[in-house]
A protein has these predicted regions:
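Phosphate-coordination loops involved in phosphoryl transfer and adenosine-cofactor binding
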Residues: 3
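Active-site and donor-binding regions of nucleotide-sugar-utilizing enzymes
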Residues: 7-30, 37-139
Length: 139
């Protein structure tokens, strides 16, 4: 794959101010392709469905994923690009980090201004205690 692409993965609705905050126009002006991958419907379906609709970015750069298989297929096809993950690591997002790790995808990780999450939910505490973060991600 010869094109330069930055793939931004978000877990909440992507608004017009997010478009500016991420500097999407700057990337485009420098010749980068941009994909905004929204995994909100998979990770936080109720939050995504009920979130404010006003000022959402609805442009062609955004791909909204409703199924894990769609996301996995997308990641496989685009694994040579640079990924910016703007999602928490928790029980709901574990599968994304696992796929990224297995595909040896290069990525940056940011947790600035993302949807808060509580990884201390009782039924998931055992998973949290079982997992060793260093073995999941190869840094």
């Amino acid at each position: 794959m010869n094109e330069k692409k930055v793939v931004i993965i978000v877990s909440s609705p992507f608004y017009l101010n997010d478009y500016d905050r991420f500097g999407i126009n700057n990337f485009l002006e420098k010749g980068f392709k941009i994909d905004i991958c929204n995994v909100g419907p998979i990770i936080y379906p109720d939050f995504y469905k009920n979130a404010e609709k006003k000022n959402r970015y609805e442009g062609s750069l955004q791909k909204v994923f409703y199924k894990k298989k769609e996301l996995k297929d997308y990641l496989l096809i685009n694994k040579k690009n640079l990924f910016l993950l703007n999602i928490h690591y928790n029980y709901s997002t574990h599968f994304i980090f696992r796929i990224i790790s297995n595909l040896n995808i290069d990525y940056l990780f940011s947790i600035i201004n993302i949807v808060p999450s509580n990884i201390e939910i009782k039924k998931y505490i055992s998973l949290k205690n079982y997992l060793n973060f260093k073995t999941i991600l190869r840094v």
